[in-house]
């Protein structure tokens, strides 16, 4: 945002130098990027008066002029301009002067006659025909009507005796994209009063506004407010010099008085405006609507714009006449013979304007301001200021009244002033009275301890925002450096984190490496693991903006993630791997926006020495390390992802806590893995509910252990787990461990049966076991096996 220091002085009186101003404003939070003098390029150019003219003796088109430059003796200057006469006031570039572009003017001779400078045109001073509409295009700029004096610096005449300050405005301060907003900031920073100006409109033009103009805001969700006034009997002409100079200082090209007024108000108030030629507004009706079926609009820059149905447009009864908040239409442009004008001062939804400007590739000054969601309360003072300027310039007759369509209810915003919390946050000791004073300087009143936030300050919503304002005017450089203070809390792990760390450590101790995979997977992963089409696990959380099809849903099973990594390792010729992961799955809940996010722990392995029982033993070891209740394994022949003869459910305390087995050969083939792949999945979240009481450590046994072996004959369908559970139940307190050491099928064993051998260890804590003790336990075990399972001793 660029502002003129001269223009700024209309609102706030400050005498600071440019350097002082930049420093104070930057320290107050409004960073100054650069400050440039407008007169930096023009040096030693003054107003001169042509005293006499005579023909050049060696040229038929040149004149030798004697010019009074206000420095005493007249100087001789040779010119070829034909529009200069004796008595004219003209710009004179004297000896050793500089013009825009680095042009250096010195004494010289033109066809043998000495010339001590140059008479200048407006173009040579860096101006355009819009800056000087009354000047000759190809002649010397005659200054007779400019109210200047001989010897006066030409920079003063053209308004270059000014500094342009460029501010870096953050998007949360839309009020500072205006001269008034920055004047308010300046007044607060320098602690001086701001000069407010309330527009005064005389009005009185003939006619009834409500009969001539109607406004229909159909897209009220995109247009919180629309204000319009009408001016009759307009006289299109160049703007006065002072207005042209101010617009030029803001980087805006003057066009004509009506258009210049809209731009002037935009700079001053930060409220974009537009002027329509009333005769081209068919039916005298302005409709604010979406483009709908309208396909194109030719904008003021002469380009045909292709409209999208949801773009906001300003239309009359039959056609669009402007792109709302971006640019007006060529079909309602202000031209030289315009008689009646409608001033639009509206507020549009920032996101809608940003979308339109981006789609059409036409970011204008207006759209840039609307994108920031400017204050809807600006529309009325802005349109009144425009009408006031019309009357000031004598550019037309303003009609009484206005049309103001308000589609929102202003909600007062208050924030409690909390001095103690603010001081604690800033590390200061500022009194409440000083805080109130800092806020008053910004025109933010405090009533009964409550801050009344003005409509133009959308950035003030919570205590931290208020603390920032206090710090700005107290001075960041005045805040002393202090050590951090406050209560500290010792860090620690939650029970879930402790269990996760322990599980990971146990897995790594067994040679497993941890992997971390994405929670986003492809829908095709369900087919890859042969998940049934009607499985509830196919109901997923879908991403709105996925990176691609392969990462378009949140996983409901963790198996595909493990198989992807195993497949990659197999493709890289890794002969054997052991991997584990603890990760979340995402299970949608009916009627809930967010899914359940239980954790799963999965183990995956392949290689020459890997098999079902090795993995089972490792799972038992990990569960034992975690102090989980003992697990039993129940055969599962229906899991489609696993081999039907080598899969079991992991059951703890009667609850299914996971699955273990060999991956189905078809699934392994889909993932490009040759050989046998073994996987175990655990409900890690559920494990927390089946933890055993804390371990009690006992002293080393004082009495010996007795070992006995049992070779049992059972049905082929009977599992080791069933036998082991029965033995433990019958063995009582004296039975310390049961270890499988052999499974035999062959001669001596009937068809359909198998021999399973266990090693049992017996021990008492208070005595040495006798043969009777040992025999009693073994007999009890054999009887239990025979009665419950029909198992006999081999």
Sequence positions of predicted segments:
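Extended, well-folded interaction surfaces typified by the phenylalanyl-tRNA synthetase beta subunit core
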Residues: 415-575, 708, 761-763, 773-794
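A carboxyl-terminal module marker
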Residues: 2, 19, 27, 441-444, ...
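Glycine/proline-enriched, intrinsically flexible loops and inter-domain linkers
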Residues: 4-5, 23, 57, 63, ...
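Mobile "lid/hinge" segments at catalytic clefts and subdomain interfaces of large enzymes
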Residues: 114-131, 135-141, 155, 163, ...
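Conserved mixed alpha/beta core segments that line enzyme active sites in large multi-domain catalysts
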Residues: 47-77, 150, 245, 256, ...
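Phosphate-backbone binding interfaces of nucleic-acid-interacting proteins
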Residues: 1-207, 342, 361, 365, ...
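Beta-rich nucleic-acid/ligand-interaction surfaces
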Residues: 39-43, 201-205, 265, 488-489, ...
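Terminal amphipathic helices with adjacent charged low-complexity linkers/tails
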Residues: 190-217, 394-422, 429
């Amino acid at each position: 945002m660029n502002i003129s220091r001269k223009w700024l002085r209309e609102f706030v009186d400050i005498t600071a130098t440019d350097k002082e101003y930049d420093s104070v404003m930057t320290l107050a939070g409004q960073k100054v990027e650069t400050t440039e003098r407008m007169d930096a390029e023009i040096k030693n150019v003054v107003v001169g008066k042509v005293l006499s003219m005579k023909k050049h003796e060696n040229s038929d088109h040149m004149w030798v002029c004697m010019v009074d430059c206000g420095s005493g003796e007249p100087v001789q200057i040779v010119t070829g301009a034909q529009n200069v006469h004796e008595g004219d006031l003209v710009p004179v570039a004297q000896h050793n002067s500089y013009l825009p572009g680095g042009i250096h003017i010195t004494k010289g001779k033109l066809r043998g006659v000495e010339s001590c400078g140059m008479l200048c045109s407006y173009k040579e001073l860096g101006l355009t025909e819009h800056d000087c509409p009354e000047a000759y295009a190809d002649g010397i700029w005659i200054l007779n009507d400019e109210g200047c004096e001989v010897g006066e610096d030409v920079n003063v005449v053209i308004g270059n005796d000014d500094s342009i300050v460029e501010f870096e405005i953050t998007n949360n301060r839309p009020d500072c994209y205006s001269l008034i907003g920055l004047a308010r900031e300046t007044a607060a920073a320098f602690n001086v009063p701001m000069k407010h100006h309330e527009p005064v409109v005389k009005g009185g033009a003939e006619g009834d506004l409500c009969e001539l103009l109607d406004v229909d805001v159909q897209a009220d969700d995109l247009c919180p407010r629309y204000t319009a006034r009408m001016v009759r009997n307009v006289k299109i002409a160049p703007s006065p010099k002072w207005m042209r100079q101010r617009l030029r200082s803001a980087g805006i090209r003057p066009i004509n008085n009506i258009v210049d007024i809209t731009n002037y108000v935009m700079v001053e108030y930060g409220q974009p405006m537009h002027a329509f030629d009333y005769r081209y507004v068919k039916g005298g009706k302005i409709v604010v609507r979406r483009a709908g079926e309208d396909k194109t609009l030719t904008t003021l820059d002469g380009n045909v714009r292709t409209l999208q149905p949801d773009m906001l447009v300003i239309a009359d009864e039959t056609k669009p006449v402007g792109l709302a908040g971006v640019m007006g239409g060529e079909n309602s442009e202000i031209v030289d013979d315009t008689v009646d004008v409608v001033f639009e001062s509206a507020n549009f939804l920032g996101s809608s304007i940003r979308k339109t400007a981006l789609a059409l590739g036409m970011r204008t000054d207006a759209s840039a301001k609307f994108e920031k969601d400017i204050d809807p309360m600006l529309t009325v003072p802005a349109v009144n200021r425009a009408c006031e300027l019309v009357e000031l310039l004598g550019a037309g007759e303003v009609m009484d009244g206005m049309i103001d369509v308000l589609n929102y209810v202003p909600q007062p915003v208050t924030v409690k002033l909390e001095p103690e919390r603010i001081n604690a946050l800033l590390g200061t000791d500022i009194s409440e009275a000083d805080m109130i004073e800092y806020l008053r300087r910004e025109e933010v009143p405090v009533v009964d301890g409550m801050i009344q936030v003005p409509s133009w300050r959308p950035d003030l919503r919570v205590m931290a925002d208020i603390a920032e304002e206090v710090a700005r005017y107290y001075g960041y450089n005045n805040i002393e450096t202090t050590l951090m203070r406050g209560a500290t809390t010792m860090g620690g792990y939650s029970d879930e984190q402790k269990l996760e760390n322990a599980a990971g450590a146990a897995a790594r101790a067994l040679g497993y490496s941890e992997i971390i995979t994405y929670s986003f997977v492809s829908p095709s992963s369900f087919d890859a693991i042969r998940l049934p089409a009607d499985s509830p696990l196919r109901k997923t959380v879908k991403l709105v903006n996925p990176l691609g099809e392969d990462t378009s849903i949140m996983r409901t099973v963790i198996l595909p993630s493990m198989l992807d990594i195993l497949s990659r390792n197999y493709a890289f010729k890794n002969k054997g791997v052991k991997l584990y992961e603890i990760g979340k799955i995402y299970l949608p809940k009916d009627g809930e926006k967010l899914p359940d996010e239980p954790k799963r722990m999965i183990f995956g392995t392949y290689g020459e020495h890997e098999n079902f029982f090795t993995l089972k033993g490792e799972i038992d070891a990990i569960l034992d390390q975690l102090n989980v209740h003992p697990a039993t394994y129940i055969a599962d022949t229906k899991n489609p992802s696993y081999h039907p003869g080598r899969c079991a459910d992991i059951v703890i305390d009667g609850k299914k806590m996971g699955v273990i087995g060999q991956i189905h050969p078809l699934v392994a083939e889909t993932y490009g893995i040759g050989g046998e792949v073994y996987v175990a999945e655990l409900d890690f979240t559920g494990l927390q509910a089946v933890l055993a009481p804390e371990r009690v450590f006992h002293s080393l046994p004082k009495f010996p252990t007795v070992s006995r072996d049992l070779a049992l004959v059972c049905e082929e369908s009977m599992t080791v787990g069933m036998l082991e559970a029965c033995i433990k139940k019958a063995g009582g307190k004296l039975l310390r461990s049961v270890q499988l050491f052999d499974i035999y099928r062959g001669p001596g064993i009937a068809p359909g049966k198998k021999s399973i051998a266990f090693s049992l260890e017996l021990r008492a804590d208070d005595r040495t076991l006798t043969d009777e003790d040992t025999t009693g336990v073994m007999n009890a075990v054999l009887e239990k096996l025979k009665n419950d399972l029909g198992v006999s001793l081999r």
